[in-house]
Amino acid sequence: LENIRQVDAIVHVVRAFDDDNITHVSGKIDPIDDIETINLELGLSDLEAVNKRLAKVERAAKGSDKEAKAELAVLQKIKPILEAGGAVRTIDFDEEEMKIVKGLFLLTSKPVLYVANIAEDDMADPEDSKYFGLIKDYAAKEGAEAIAVAAEAEEEIAQLDDDEKQDFLEAEGVEEPGLNRLIRASYHLLGLQTFFTAGGKETRAWTFKTGTKAPQAAGIIHSDFERGFIRAEVMAFADLDQFESEAAVKEAGKLRVEGKDYVMEDGDIVEFRFNV
């Protein structure tokens, strides 16, 4: 478990299919029991870490160490939740408390995405899976998201060329590979979005945190872009898809000129103007 303390989020894959040829360690298919077993292990590991930290911080907090006192208060807020089988991510923290929580690297403080590993027969409509609904309901109770992916089919899809892949998806009655949905859900979980730049024959995708303003997004490409930022010329990917060329987007009045306070949106296609 120590290997995942440094990660930003957890993707929890849960079996959600029946197959007599694939045995389950408990002899039955019960995704909620599987989830709770793992969550219990994570919670117990966190409780052990909190108790160890408490022993150190309590001594320091007896003096005039304000940081120790603040951390002690957070640890005392966390401990009873873990003892009751809860997750740290379900606790409301203010901004200062959250800084302390992040420094503790607790496993149950991390956002989680539940992935139901469904049968190939359920790909077209995951809601038909008798297990997926249970997983979604469980996730909703803790404010998490759940998606369905047929892992065995995804493995097969990954080995196909583009034409074969499209034929496979059409035969299964699905629009896109589950991997695409997994990537989007993971981006959403981490608060990440994408903008694009295009020049000559090269088009690049850049990842940014939701809420990033144009100058800071420009700085992802190069620090000079942020330092000398003048403006951003922006078109939405949906508009380019509709009008099919940059010239047509401009003619339709869909090309926008944005300043330093512009908050970037997912799918923006941008040309940054700068001077240094």
Name these PLM-found stretches:
Residues L1-H12, A16-E36, F93-L104, D128-Y131:
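Switch II of P-loop NTPase G domains
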Residues K56-E265, V270-V276:
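C-terminal-of-GTPase-core extension/linker across diverse P-loop GTPases
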